[in-house]
Amino acid sequence: MEKSQGYLELDKSWRHNFLYPLIFQEYIYALAHEQGLNRSILLENTDHDNKYSSLIVKRLITLIHQQNHFLIFDNDSNQNPFWKHNNNLYSQTISEGFVIIVEIPFSPRFVDSLEEKKKILKSNNLRSIHSIFPFLEDQILHLNFVANILIPYPIHLEIVVQSLRYRVKDASSLHLLRFFLFTLNKSISSFSKRNQRFFLFLYNSHVYEYESTFLFLRNKTSHLRSTSSGAFLERIFFYGKIKHLIEVFANDFQAILWLFKDPFMHYVRYQGKSILASKRTSLRMNKWKYYLVNFWQCQFYVWSQPGRVSINQLSNHSLDFLGYLSSVRRNPLAVRSQMLENSFLTDNAIKKFDIIVLLISLIGSLAKAKFCNVLGHPLSKPARADSSDSDIIERFVRICRNLSHYHSGSSKKKSLYRIKYILRLSCARTLARKHKTTVRSFLKRLGSELLEEFLTEDGQVISLIFPRTSSTSWRLYRGGIWYLDITCINDLANHE
């Protein structure tokens, strides 16, 4: 942590939340462009030159100011393409550096270093995409209605700047941000495609502002979770997972599972959408629906319509998001009760949260990437002439393992086996196409080596993580397991 402070405590201005001086640091742009450096330099390499490279950045900012943007960004063929290219390059360079700087206060390692003195312990696992699904397994069974929300976009760029000023206290940085947004307004679509990280940060910061206000109101309403026998029966699957984990990590879990107060509303955001689930009635959910629309329009000047919020009952509705199809289904369960000398069986219908992977969607994603056709028949991929066989195999195996890793929480593994088959045969056809031979003869010559590369199951990986009991790893693998190190959506898993 001492090394991290060597970079982040550049001078007294940093203590006053002045980010603008960092724009003149040369290593910021090396980080942005990944020219021989990576993001770890910011926190690990303190021997780098700390002098301000003001000449470089001032030249970029000055050249942008001197250009006639109404001519440069116009699609006039008479304009010099050299100046247009340079101007876009200057803007993109500074904007990439700007994002690197503004993200520093939100860096997990930086926040941990600042809070180390306060002894504040935080779990970074909640940053994982897969952390959403254990939450749903534990909470959604007790809820009745779910609202699918399309998050609206701000109608004016100045709203984004006003939202960010609550977090960034440096006026100079905000003026530079405003300069980017308004001077690039005519070519905002092309600029956003070249620098998606810049606009993704602005979007998340804007959404965070109204989410913090909305969640504050949501946390004011809560009720005690039901302690009926039916509620405990519905949680046996979730408690079962914790029980298996306690066998391995005995010191990391509490022996007693406490009951806490349960909020009326549960909120999850993903990919420009959000889910609002509640135990209340349909009438109360519709009130929240119109409250959200008015809240967006009146408080944050965001145009929205009631049609962007759809309310459904969980018992007959499935949630399709993040590459999974989630639903609540009822399972029969017989419970034996003992009362003095008499025993009797009671039939119960408990709710279980079921998560599956849609095979059709996965095949559609593979077909879009040219690994197969729309019917799921494997195709050969064009291989570079200088690519070795091992490089081609490693590429296919990496894609296969990433998909298996991302979809490991599925309760049905047959879909993943079909995907592995498609990728394995597509790899064989790609290699056969490269060597100008048939797939049969190539597999006969290669032997079982290609097959072994694709047969590394997740269960074998879990057995390495949980070495104490093989039965524990097998139960976890059969029921699905969530990895809390996944922080981005797999491209082939993003069907929306």
Swiss-Prot record:
The keyword NADP does not apply. Its main location: plastid. The keyword Plastid applies. GO terms for cellular component: chloroplast. Signal peptide: none annotated. One of its GO terms (molecular function) is RNA binding. Keywords: Chloroplast, mRNA processing, Plastid, RNA-binding, tRNA processing. InterPro entries: Domain_X, Maturase_MatK, Maturase_MatK_N. One of its GO terms (biological process) is RNA splicing. It holds the Pfam family Intron_maturas2. It is found in: Plastid, Chloroplast. It comes from the Eukaryota. Belongs to the intron maturase 2 family. MatK subfamily. Usually encoded in the trnK tRNA gene intron. Probably assists in splicing its own and other chloroplast group II introns. PANTHER family: MATURASE K (PTHR34811:SF1). This is Maturase K. It comes from Paeonia cambessedesii.
